[in-house]
Structure formats: C-alpha cells, structure tokens
C-alpha cells in the first residue's frame, strides 16, 4: 500500500526550506522602495542559531558601502540562549553582506543620488542559506505616508465591494 501524502510532504519541505525569518514592515511604510537586491550575509554560528529561532530585529538597520564592501549596521540579533557568554556574538556588530562587485558598483552609483538609502527588508532561508533582501528606498514625507495609507484603504474597500457582488 502506497503512502498518500508524497506531494504534500515535498511541498511542506520546500516551504520550510524557503521561509521568512524576519521582516522589516516599517521600512515599506517609511520608504518608497525603488529596487530590491538579494544578498548573502556573513554570520557566525550563534547568529545563525538565533536567526533561525526568530531572534532578529531589522527595524533600525541600514546598509553602507565602505572599502568596496556592503556592510549591514544596527541590526540586532539576540545572543543565543544556549551558548556561554564567551562564545556568543555581539548583538549589534557590523556584518558584511555578500554581493557581486557589479551589483555593489551599481548601488554605489545610485546611492550618490540625494535621498536614497539601502534598507534591509527581510531575512529568509533559501535552502540552507540565510539571505537578506535589501531595498533601495527614498524616504517618504508625512503627507506621502498619509496619501499611501489612503490609497491602500480605498483599494481594500474596492476589493471588499467587488467581492460582495
């Protein structure tokens, strides 16, 4: 007798291998995201364990290009609870991001424009690798935020009205 859940288990395995670990929802409210880029991130072992446990906060994070390298600043990854103090990592250390040289050069050219910044949008698993999605964003003014919120509300009401009929 054959097992009946082969496809479900494979789909569940793929979903588990590509799951979202941390999300910066505030960034999409504060910035207009013009372009996104997926990069690798250089981590130590206790950081990987903490991120997989959901102990990462991207809210105050930003990225800079220094000495030709992409660097992630001000992202808090909590110390691993089951590691001793000696072997644990610094929660706010500067982390190196892994991207191709041409991608970094392209970003440097775009960042030279006034008002653009690199913001971490989310951390996710891609197979066994932890990836960081960066967004090239332009800061929104207060009236832009209000207009975006109003547009979002109108679209929501329109969808609800159309679904009733």
Swiss-Prot record:
HAMAP family membership: SmpB
Major subcellular location class: cytoplasm
Organism: Synechococcus sp. (strain WH7803)
Gene Ontology biological process terms, A to Z: trans-translation
Cross-referenced InterPro entries: SmpB (IPR023620), SsrA-bd_prot (IPR000037), SsrA-bd_prot_CS (IPR020081)
A GO term for molecular function: RNA binding
GO CC terms: cytosol
Name the record gives this protein: SsrA-binding protein
Record-linked SUPFAM superfamilies: Small protein B (SmpB)
Function: Required for rescue of stalled ribosomes mediated by trans-translation. Binds to transfer-messenger RNA (tmRNA), required for stable association of tmRNA with ribosomes. tmRNA and SmpB together mimic tRNA shape, replacing the anticodon stem-loop with SmpB. tmRNA is encoded by the ssrA gene; the 2 termini fold to resemble tRNA(Ala) and it encodes a 'tag peptide', a short internal open reading frame. During trans-translation Ala-aminoacylated tmRNA acts like a tRNA, entering the A-site of stalled ribosomes, displacing the stalled mRNA.
UniProt keywords, alphabetically: Cytoplasm, RNA-binding
Subcellular location: Cytoplasm
Pfam families hit by this protein: SmpB
Family note: Belongs to the SmpB family.
